[in-house]
Amino acid sequence: MGRVSLCLVIMFFICSAQKIDAQVQNIREKQDTISATKSLEHIRPENIKKGPLNNALDVLSGQSAGVNVTTNGTDRLAMLNSIRVRGTTSIMGGNDPLVIIDGVTSDIATLSTIYPADIESFTILKNATETAMYGSRGASGVIEIKTKKGTGRGFEISYDGNYGFESMYKHLQMLNGPEYIATAEALGLDYNNGGYNTNFHDVITRTGLIHQHHLAFSGGSENSNYRASFGFMDHNTIVKVNDYRNLVVKLDATQKAFDGRLVGDFGVYGYSSKIHDIFDTRMLFYSAAAQNPTYPAGTDVNGNWVKNSAASHINHPGALLYEKNDSEERNFNTHLGLKFNILDNLILSAFGSYSYSSTGNAQFCPTWVWAQGNVYRGEFKGEDYFTNVSLSYNNAWGDSHLDAVVGAEYLKQVRTGLWVQAKGITTNDFSYNNIGATSSRPFGGTSSSYEDPSLASIMGSVTYSYKDRYSIAAALRGDGSSMVSDNNTFGFFPSVSLGWDVKKEGFLSDTDFITILKLRTGYGRSGNLGGITSYTTLNTVKENGIVSINGAPTVTMGSIRNTNPDLKWETRSTFNIGFDLGIWDNRLMLTSELYYSKTTDMLYEYDVPVPTFAFDKLMANIGSMSNQGVELGISVVPIQRKDMEMNINFNMSYQKNKLLSLSGEYNGMHMTASDITPIGSLYGVGQNGGDNNVVYQIVGQPLGVFCLPHCKGLKENELGGYSYDIEDLNDDGEIDFSDGGDRYIAGQATPKVTIGSNISFRYKSFDIAMQINGAFGHKIFNGTGLAYTNMSIFPDYYVMKGAPE
């Protein structure tokens, strides 16, 4: 049985009595305003979650079936979040959904900087019927964000802010100083006694402080309005010396002309963030847990950090706090959109945007952590130029209604990078601010990069409905990318969907308790370019050493990639069928979706012979993977009165992933990869030297499964000691810990089932809301317990209190 991960959030607040729960409201709006062929999900964050929100991604968490938001790193505010829409669809390709903010192509990092108070709504596109319109960028789903604009109600101003504190909820229960000494003496082991009783978690942690402020004002009339907002956040994390600051500025203006036939939308968005971190946070906590507790918290009388030379895997935690890993990111984008009603049913739209980003990173590792020290500086810049033009037509005659859109767009990107690394620090006082004062430049430590990919697209869609009851929609998008090979420059991504509004049929028209009943199905294809760069298809070279030619040092070059003229994007085909049901005036609403998707032409890197090839690796489109599942959403309004209202919303998703194949043909050559490949291993003392892999990629299994030796317990040896009794699973008389040896599949690392629920209750102006998120059907490997209960590393390394038992 899998582990259960449960998140419970309870918030109290005061708000206007006119607000109703967003999910019920949005489901009603969705069913009333969109075609029965669609399965879009709209989320309005100002109503869904109330109380403090750290960033826009907090709004998405638990709100939509099949959409999982997780945090990478120790600091959930400063580190990048991960979003998966209906699971993992690729090994080497991108798995992040495409993010569109006010029509501007963006990414999750930028989305995480937007203040929730600036967001009008989210729209989540999951099925290929919808994502096919984004072609080669839509295979992992699409998240469209619409930010707030001017209301035209005259001048308005708003402010919201909050202060908060944070601390570690739970510490590892490690041996203290006296317990450490007593255990070592009881076991007859030699140990170092520094004479202290230090809790090294207290050395590296503190009570964190966060405060954020958001100011917005808007004004104007219905024909000409604006909205501007400013946001600031300062977060001192629970790790000493770590902090994160973010400043956001946003401006939007809308202008109408020619009696509203021409509408112009102009927007500017910019943010600047600074992160002060250390070089390796994982090593910091590992060192704090494993350090000898009898050592001092600071330096000795000579100013040196006390360390057991036998404990080579760790450093003094206090010394690690002097590491630096500082980042500064600036982002600016602006857009202009125009819509002109040529005729009452014919609209010409044009949109253009420009985005600029700059990221600087500086790292410093002092000589008391690394013998020669280490300094790194890097600067990365990016520019995006985007434009599209579309023509939309709609018309109704008799019982028929037709909507049609044709368009074209072009995206040009420029990416540059420059970085340098050095060792041999003259003095730690320079930190990373004087690389010239270092004595050693590692080969390959200084380099630069450049790429300028482009994407040109044409698209069209048609939706026809009869009697506002039967609907059919078809779409086709063609993409031409500079990153794929000449043989596959263009790719085409079609979709078709059907919808039936059953409630409007005669046999249900008199059924009063059913308010809505709609059925839909669809099929579509989308692409994935995430695993390809501007140089992936080329036989590229790279410097591989320095030799002396005629007495002059000369850099030699060598191949690092084979040419593949047939390389192209991955293709994901999806079939879905679903329904929406509302009863008792939509007081109870059910929505469900069943889907199956298959990724083909999956990118993977294969071993190839040399000299047949110039390099021993070849990336090719051969593998395949499937995802299937069912999603369920339930919304209930058990109480709905003037002064009292209660809303209950629940969503659940079951998802099954399977790696189907990694073998196939390439130009008459059979290409194959190992059926079992390690993708995750243990790290730490006692876990090196091989046989420490725990997570695997196995053909025929979900991507990321635990494949482990089976321990039956303890067995006594001839000397009266005990050792682990490992089962010989293949009955060959030997215990083999290697990959594919005596191991069994112990479970998968990703959840099979995820749930999200929101319960809100309002009485007059008092509201209370509760959110519960959960994940089921997966396993969590307790590497922490394995590392800190291993008595073979004691007393050089610290262990947990229960380990000696």
Protein language model features and the residues they cover:
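Conserved small-residue
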Residues: 158-193, 421, 620, 637-749, ...
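Extracellular/periplasmic, surface-exposed regions of secreted and cell-surface proteins
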Residues: 3, 208-211, 246, 252-258, ...
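Extracytoplasmic gating/loop element in the C-terminal half of outer-membrane beta-barrel translocons
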Residues: 190, 481, 775-805
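Short aromatic-centered micro-motifs
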Residues: 99, 464, 729, 761
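Acidic, glycine-rich flexible loop segments
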Residues: 212, 282-317
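Short, small/polar-rich motifs associated with maturation and membrane association
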Residues: 1-257, 262-271, 317, 331-333, ...
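Glycine-rich, aromatic-lined ligand/substrate-binding cores of catalytic
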Residues: 748-783
